[in-house]
Amino acid sequence: EAIAQGRQRILLTLATGTGKTCIAFQAAWKLFHSRWSLHAQTHPAAAKKRPRILFLADRNVLANQAFNDFGPFGEDAIVRIEPGEVKKLGAVPKNASVFFTIFQTFMSGPEDEHGNKTPYFGQYPEDFFDFIIIDECHRGGANDESSWRDILDYFAPAVQLGLTATPKRTVNADTYSYFGEPVYSYALKEGINDGFLTPFKVLPIVGTLDEYV
């Protein structure tokens, strides 16, 4: 609904283990099969073309997990962007519909003749991606002082969906300032009450380790 209403930045807050990747998959799947794209919104004839979707994470384990979960799209539609493969090919991959990478890979890149780093994300046109999913977006991607923010600003034309398990706090206020208030939230307590998460108890343990350090 948020995409249909023209929202450019969207935030979902769900407790860990309650299906953030599944929701990201379903959103991408629907856009992919409906042939939705930013260009098609103003040029209906362009609706014949599949959208280009980027999944950004801050750790390889998350990017790899998402890449495997998105397998139903078909091996010709998805691609994992890795620095070794980019160096081998001499360029970033562009012949796919759903791209997976981590911020660190996109921020890396060769130096130009003046010794300035040219990040790999700059090899894509600014309007290359229609939809960007930012997993664990509270980890710094929306921070004004973060170099990761350069990626989000560069691909500003795309609809950006931030996923986080962290409720609003002082330390992640930048995330909420950038994306706005969540369009949907599902708290840890709700996940436990609904049977999706295991109840837990916090047991304080008093140790003597500090006496020996």
Residue ranges and their predicted role:
Residues 1-213:
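RecA-like P-loop NTPase motor core of helicase/translocase proteins
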